[in-house]
């Protein structure tokens, strides 16, 4: 597209939309037009091993003409909603690029408010290098955040499931209650946390009887 006079093309993608704990991260990336051997493994970040993503992240930053990552907290997701957080984050990620693109590609996401033309591509993180690069930046950034968060909240196994709604995770919320980093606006978190509160109330009542 840049060769057709549209200017640099930025890919945008998110990580953590489907999680119930922790932030959502949104990345934007502009890569050179020419193939880059060190980035030959680039594809949808969900199809890459953790070790491959870790290796690719510094290489993407090394070769990118511009890149940015925006992190939106669980508290803001609860306040504004995940859809608003996602769209706002994508606009902010593109605006934060040191080189402004002439065109934006998203992974199937419709994003009103871009200042340049854009195109949602279904399966874009597997077919467009710039989206794949943004996908890796977003996911690896968020995975690192969740691994660090596990040190502060060790009861939930965040370093394993990265805040997604696994059985082990939701059982932990029922047993320990939700942490400040959980998304209380999500029905499964609210329900599990309420079950913990109910059990805690019963324990208090029995203990005081």
Swiss-Prot record:
Residues 7-198 form the RNase H type-2 domain. It is found in: Cytoplasm. Manganese or magnesium. Binds 1 divalent metal ion per monomer in the absence of substrate. May bind a second metal ion after substrate binding. The keyword Metal-binding applies. GO terms for biological process: DNA replication, removal of RNA primer; mismatch repair. Disulfide bonds: none annotated. This is Ribonuclease HII.
């Amino acid at each position: 597209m840049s060769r057709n006079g549209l200017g640099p093309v930025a890919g945008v993608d998110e990580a953590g939309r489907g999680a119930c704990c922790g932030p959502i991260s949104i990345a934007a990336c502009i890569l050179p037009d020419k193939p880059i051997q060190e980035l030959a493994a680039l594809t949808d970040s969900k199809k890459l091993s953790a070790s491959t993503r870790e290796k690719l992240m510094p290489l993407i930053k090394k070769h990118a003409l511009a890149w940015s990552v925006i992190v939106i907290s669980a508290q803001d997701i609860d306040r504004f909603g995940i859809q608003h957080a996602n769209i706002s984050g994508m606009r902010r990620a593109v605006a934060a690029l040191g080189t402004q693109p002439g065109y934006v590609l998203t992974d199937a996401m419709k994003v009103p408010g871009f200042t340049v033309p854009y195109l949602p591509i279904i399966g874009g993180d597997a077919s467009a290098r710039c989206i794949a690069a943004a996908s890796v930046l977003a996911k690896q950034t968020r995975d690192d955040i969740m691994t660090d968060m596990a040190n502060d909240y060790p009861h939930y196994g965040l370093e394993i499931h990265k805040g997604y709604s696994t059985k082990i995770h939701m059982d932990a919320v029922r047993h320990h209650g939700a942490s400040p980093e959980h998304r209380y606006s999500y029905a499964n978190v609210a329900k599990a946390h309420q079950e913990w509160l109910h059990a805690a109330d019963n324990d208090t009542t029995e203990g005081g009887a």
